[in-house]
From Swiss-Prot:
It comes from Bombina maxima. The keyword Signal applies. GO terms for biological process: defense response; positive regulation of smooth muscle contraction; vasodilation. This is Kininogen-1b. The lineage of its organism: Eukaryota, Metazoa, Chordata, Craniata, Vertebrata. Belongs to the bradykinin-related peptide family. GO terms for molecular function: hormone activity; toxin activity. Residues 1-23 form the signal peptide.
Amino acid sequence: MRLWFCLSFFIVLCLEHFPETLADERNVPESEEKTEQYLRDLPKINRKGPRPPGFSPFRGKFHSQSLRDLPKINRKGPRPPGFSPFRGKFHSQSLRDLPKINRKGPRPPGFSPFRGKFHSQSLRDLPKINRKGPRPPGFSPFRGKFHSQSLRDLPKINRKGPRPPGFSPFRGKFHSQSLRDLPKINRKGPRPPGFSPFRGKFHSQSHV
């Protein structure tokens, strides 16, 4: 009993004489450490002055890290397309790479004014498509995208004229991508071994 009492008394004395070691580690919560490390990467923010857009003084951090890369946004003035003043962030990060879109004017193909984003990101790489004029093969005006991305690499195909072997005008794509690497096959002439004129492809890819 005497040894136990002496040990406990010695520990209490150590804590009183060295308060900067164990006492400070117990008093610092984990949440404050995380917020301090997070704010160290940001410029100094005056809590009483104007704050950057999306910054919450209660949490001590930004609502969205994407706002750190954007210029300062005037909440009372015009906002970039797809920006929500309530959440303080964009509906879609893909809009950051697009030019400003006038919601009342003509919009790029496949852009939805309700969702504030494109139906398909593949449309961003395509030139502007006139919905009332001729459309590229395989393009659906209802979905605002291509039925098959493989058609983007092919030259424009005339649906009323001769089509490449294996191309289906109904599906707007090839029955087999392996035919793209083969020379044009004359269906009425001699065919390579293993080629089926009905399926428009080889029975076995090993023949290629």
